Amino acid sequence: MISRNMYKTGAVLMALVTAFTVTGLSGCKSRTVSNEVTTEYDIPDDYNDERPGVTYGNVDEISYYSPTTGSERKAYVYLPRDYDESQSYPVVYLLHGMSGSYSEYNRIGALYVAQNAVDDYNRNPVIMVSFTVFTDADGGQESDYDFSELTAKYDACEYDVINALIPYINEHYST
């Protein structure tokens, strides 16, 4: 079992990402990037917990067609509190570990981590997308590949994200 402390690294990274105007991956109109970097945050113990009295955004489970796998794939889209379709948001694409899936970040409370970071550190809200990195029709769950075959399936993820997932997100959400 993975301990809460192991997720603090993820929380720090997510807090750092929300510290800047994230551009490039999803067609945000702004090209402003902060040149001031803060590398230390006091991460509260409840960083990935649902906090009483805090309003959180919504999580959409989506399906998009992947030409890489020739199948429908699922992803979670984490929308910030007070999501407004007339406003553009930066998008953060979350990559899981080798044996994970799109649901990993949902399981560890990514929506809470993101909103808590916005509230704790006065950062701009972002849209986050978690997806299955492994580009096999079954998501790698029933595979019997050797390591080189597995890494090739992961490497194909770049094509899938650029040609299927990002266009889907840009078409259906305010980026």
Question: Which residue stretches match the model-derived regions?
Answer:
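Non-catalytic cap/lid and distal C-terminal segments of serine-dependent acyl enzymes
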Residues: K29-T175
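Gram-positive cell-envelope targeting signals
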Residues: M1-T38
